[in-house]
UniProtKB/Swiss-Prot annotation:
The N-terminal domain determines nucleotide recognition and specific binding, while the C-terminal domain determines the specific binding to the target protein. The keyword Nucleotide-binding applies. It is found in: Cytoplasm. This is Molybdenum cofactor guanylyltransferase.
């Protein structure tokens, strides 16, 4: 029996460093940022969910289910992950941000292999130097643990990792895979990277 793996693209933040622009909808090389992310992960998963707390109608135009946080008040990526975990029947959920248009094409395969090899509950990606805290594969049955963590006032996702058997998978062989956009200057640099990829 093959595993079902779904994905959630996190587009629920406030994007303060981008002047408040909705990062997933910022245009990059003629496409919305989230479209680049969708193209990278679609071949790797069964279903895609989009977590968005504004512009939901616009996000729905991409043809996927759009979910707003169950917890109100822009509580960060944990809130979006909790919501998505409550809407999937998959064996695993891939979590990615909306502003990483160069995500690895073998992201799921490698994160899943890391989980299975280490009998872990979740795997987090690393660029070889730094962990990418919102690029992970996890079991949706971790939802209650994450929900309790958030409702206790915690926000730091790496503190939540520490409560579970988490493995880190290095993608040092793809150094630009997790380059994202937080400023207009980064957007310009990334546009050039995409042209070369």
């Amino acid at each position: 029996m093959s595993l079902q793996i779904d994905a959630v693209i996190l587009a629920g933040g406030m994007a303060r460093r981008m002047g408040g622009d909705d990062k997933g909808l910022v245009e990059l090389n003629g496409k919305a940022m989230i479209e680049h992310t969708i193209e990278r992960i679609k071949p790797q998963v069964k279903e895609i969910l989009i977590n968005a707390n504004r512009n939901q109608t616009r996000y729905a135009e991409f043809g996927f289910t759009v979910l707003s946080d169950e917890h109100t008040g822009f509580l960060g990526p944990l809130a979006g992950m909790i919501t998505a975990m409550g809407h999937t029947q998959a064996d695993y959920l891939l979590v990615v941000p909306c502003d990483c248009p160069l995500l690895p094409r073998d992201l799921v395969a490698r994160l899943l292999a890391a989980i299975e090899t280490n009998d872990a509950e979740l795997a987090v990606a690393s660029d070889g130097e730094y962990q990418q805290p919102v690029v992970m594969l996890l079991k949706p049955n971790l939802r209650e643990s994450m929900k309790a963590f958030l409702e206790a006032g915690e926000r730091k996702i790496d503190f939540w990792y520490a409560k579970h058997h988490c493995v880190v998978e290095s993608f040092a062989d793809q150094p630009n895979a997790f380059v994202n956009v937080n400023t207009p200057e980064q957007k310009q640099r990334l546009a050039a990277e995409i042209n070369q990829s």
